[in-house]
UniProtKB/Swiss-Prot annotation:
Gene: pnp
Compartments, as annotated in UniProt: Cytoplasm
Glycosyltransferase found in the keyword field: no
Cofactor(s) needed: Mg(2+)
Family: Belongs to the polyribonucleotide nucleotidyltransferase family.
One GO MF term: 3'-5'-RNA exonuclease activity
Function: Involved in mRNA degradation. Catalyzes the phosphorolysis of single-stranded polyribonucleotides processively in the 3'- to 5'-direction.
Keywords associated with the record: Cytoplasm, Magnesium, Metal-binding, Nucleotidyltransferase, RNA-binding, Transferase
Protein name: Polyribonucleotide nucleotidyltransferase
Main location: cytoplasm
GO biological process assignments: mRNA catabolic process; RNA processing
Upper classification of the organism: Bacteria, Pseudomonadati, Pseudomonadota, Alphaproteobacteria, Hyphomicrobiales
Organism: Mesorhizobium japonicum (strain LMG 29417 / CECT 9101 / MAFF 303099)
One Pfam family in the UniProt entry: RNase_PH_C
Residues engaged in binding Mg(2+): 488, 494
Length: 715
């Protein structure tokens, strides 16, 4: 019934198994991949014919984590998986980026890849396995895919590169780098690092590329016995149309791309495009020689070639800069004075308004992942409204691109954040991209660094980011610093590097062609370092470090520690005690399992009142000390006084006053404020208090003549 095939190799000290032929047999390609005991199922379906009118490749990648994979049941009312989590979105992008450039040029058939985590051993992250499984499924599917692709994670632990570290090992690593590519070339890099140098980062990329070669060999071995017949597909040849178009508008298009202002340039390009459409419009009653989609597609190709030729031939770019010059930068802080911290970072025609907000433990984000629940205290949200590029468009929840760009900036900043002990605040940063012409994610990095320092967050060092590009034709190439949007779309590489003056904290690379050598990557990294140092210098005109004090409107947090066996006393039955403290003092209180108590308020008096209240609950009263208390109950034999937080004690009728007392109510009534001295505890542990030894007017102990005391005791 099943035509099963299986390949197994040892990879990174664990078995990697690729299986096909048993599950999801109606998909064009399906592979069940196992690494350690983590399993993912990758499926590929590509329609037999393209939809008419498409001028792009409709590829969709859906990565999904099923909670049953880790033996869990989803939370929420419906108890089933819902919208994609942030990690699912990020891994979907991670899979998409290295495979997209490898589909044949001109292939526009609707293609969907679904990757499902069906088992998680809580040791091996399924993201790398998902790249491998997808590559294998595509290689078997028969679609025109120029793979296979391999992928690997690289850590840097105790001064050595580690291939595919376990999840718990990553806590010790100074590097979290994912690299993917073919047997000959690197296509994608995604990383977070703790201020590592350029040479070390490049070494990690090459180590990872070498590390996944056995995976590519295993996929080829599986394809030799299980691959479907390749589909008949011939890339359309539009060279004749391109030649005609070049004759008609070649010079005009070249001149349009010499206009430095973005809006004026776009208007000139649109005018050229309109001329092209008019030139190829059929006469009345005639069939068109080319479809509008073909004309549009070839015009895009011609745009790319014109820009690329100009750069390679002249060394001059669209906006007139040379290859290494960074656009003019203006950095401002405190632009929104009532917020906790704010910055406006402008680089050429790219601008980010970034706002930092300080919160308490209550504001931490709870994340329920397959590996368990954890709390995130640093949040970074990137928004890209359509007005930033002079367009109208959809507004609403963030798309994949916005989530991905926000995470890239988050990775760049996180290594420089203070520890929770040093700065016990939850941090939320929002980057509003108000203008965009390339490199908005790196503007977010710069703006975030400034906004956090403006808020008084003690970053270890300021962080800046720069986006690099590449134009390569044959042996000729040009590496571009601080790329524009057009240079990103029409170039061969998008290489984003963020870091401090001392090293790299985040690196992301996407390459659209094969043949990017180690030499080119080294040039790009070195050029990016120069650009980063320049940007840090420009940012320093606004701020060089964190402000010494928090903003006027930011909450203050003080931390105290209590014994863990006292936590229940502070919280009270059903939260009664802590609610009362919050209501009466106005402070916010967060208690950790280890006894750490964080008290937050913008009012110092509220914090002090809450601290004092909690202290009285957890501290033990000392014998011989005098306390102020409140009479809570009277009886024939004395009065009960609440004198130390929730603690009550008895003042016996004989201890109410120095003279003989007939009735308790003659001396005190419920609600009276009194001073009491803790005399000790009886044999049952009950508190013994005295009022008569304390001056009720001053709260001071009454000093009596020792000889008189002796005579009184004898009597």
């Amino acid at each position: 019934m099943f035509n099963q095939h299986k390949v197994e190799i040892e990879w990174g000290g664990r078995p990697l198994i690729l299986e096909t032929g048993k599950i999801a047999r109606q998909a064009d390609g399906a592979v069940l991949a196992t690494y350690g005991e983590t399993k993912v199922l990758a499926t590929v379906v590509s329609m037999k014919e393209p939809k008419p009118g498409l001028d792009f490749f409709p590829l969709t990648v859906n990565y999904q984590e099923k909670t049953y994979a880790a033996g869990k049941i989803p939370g929420g009312y419906f108890k089933r998986e819902g919208r994609p989590s942030e990690k699912e979105t990020l891994v979907s992008r991670l899979i998409d980026r290295p495979i997209r450039p490898l589909f044949a040029d001109g292939y526009k058939n609707d293609t969907q890849i679904v990757v499902t985590v069906v088992q998680h051993d809580l040791e091996n992250d399924p993201d790398i396995l998902s790249i491998v499984a997808t590559s294998a499924a595509l290689t078997l599917s028969g679609v025109p895919f120029m793979g296979p692709v391999g992928g690997a994670r690289v850590g840097y632990i105790n001064g050595e590169y580690v291939l595919n570290p376990h999840i718990d090992e990553m806590q010790e690593s100074k590097l979290d780098l994912v690299v993917a590519g073919t047997a000959d070339a690197v296509l994608m890099v995604e990383s977070e690092a703790k201020e590592l140098g350029e040479e070390l980062m490049l070494g990690a990329v090459m180590f990872g590329h070498k590390g996944f070669q056995p995976v590519i060999d295993a996929i080829i071995k599986l394809a030799e016995v299980a691959a479907k017949e390749p589909r008949d597909f011939t890339a359309p040849d539009y060279s004749a149309l391109e030649g005609e178009m070049l004759k008609i508008v070649g010079d005009e298009l070249s001149n349009a791309y010499k206009i430095t202002d973005k809006q004026q340039r776009y208007a000139a390009v649109d005018a050229v495009k309109a001329k092209v459409k008019a030139a190829f419009a059929p006469a009345e009653g005639e069939e068109p020689k080319y479809t509008s989609e073909q004309i549009g597609s070839v015009f895009k190709e011609l745009q790319a070639k014109v820009v690329r030729w100009n750069i390679l031939d002249t060394g001059s770019r669209i906006d007139g800069r040379d290859l290494k010059t960074v656009r003019k930068i203006v950095s401002e802080v405190g632009v929104l004075p009532r917020t906790h911290g704010s910055a406006l970072f402008t680089r050429g025609e790219t601008q980010a308004l970034v706002v930092a907000t300080l919160g308490t433990g209550e504001d931490e984000q709870y994340v329920d992942s397959l590996t368990g629940m954890y709390k995130e205290k640093f949040l970074l949200h990137y928004n890209f409204p359509p007005y930033s590029v002079g367009e109208t468009g959809r507004m609403g929840s963030p798309g994949r691109r916005e989530i991905g760009h926000g995470k890239l900036a988050w990775r760049a900043i996180r290594p420089m954040l203070p520890s929770a002990d040093q700065f016990p605040y939850t941090l939320r940063v929002v980057s509003e991209i108000t203008e965009s012409n390339g490199s908005s994610s790196m503007a977010t990095v710069c703006g975030t660094s400034l906004a956090l320092m403006d808020a008084g967050v003690p970053l270890a060092k300021p962080v800046a980011g720069i986006a690099m590009g590449l134009i390569k034709e044959g042996e000729r190439f040009a590496v571009l610093s601080d790329i524009l949007g057009d240079e990103d779309h029409l170039g061969d590489m998008d290489f984003k590097v963020a870091g401090t003056a001392n090293g790299i904290t985040s690196l992301q690379m996407d390459i659209k062609i094969e043949g990017i050598t180690e030499e080119i990557m080294k040039i790009a990294l070195d050029q990016a370092k120069d650009g980063r140092q320049h940007i840090l210098g420009e940012m320093a005109h606004a701020l060089t470090g964190a402000r010494p004090e928090l903003g006027e409107f930011a909450p203050r947090i003080e931390v105290m520690h209590i014994p863990t066996d006292k936590i229940r006393d502070v919280i009270g039955s059903g939260g009664k005690v802590i609610r009362e403290i919050v209501e009466k003092t106005g402070a916010k209180i967060n208690i950790e399992d280890d006894g750490t108590v964080k008290i937050a308020s913008s009012n110092a008096k509220e914090i002090e009142a809450a601290k004092k209240w909690i202290h009285t609950i957890v501290a033990e009263p000392e014998v011989g000390e005098i306390y102020e208390g409140t009479v809570v109950k009277t009886a024939d034999f004395g009065a009960f006084v609440n004198f130390f937080g929730p603690r009550d004690g008895l003042v016996h009728i004989s201890q109410l006053a120095n003279e003989r007392v007939a009735k308790t109510s003659d001396v005190v009534k419920e609600g009276d404020k009194v001073w009491v001295k803790l005399m000790g505890f009886d044999e049952r542990g009950k508190v013994r208090l005295s009022m008569k030894v304390v001056d009720q007017a001053t709260g001071k102990e009454i000093v009596r003549d020792k000889r008189a005391e002796g005579e009184e005791d004898a009597a």
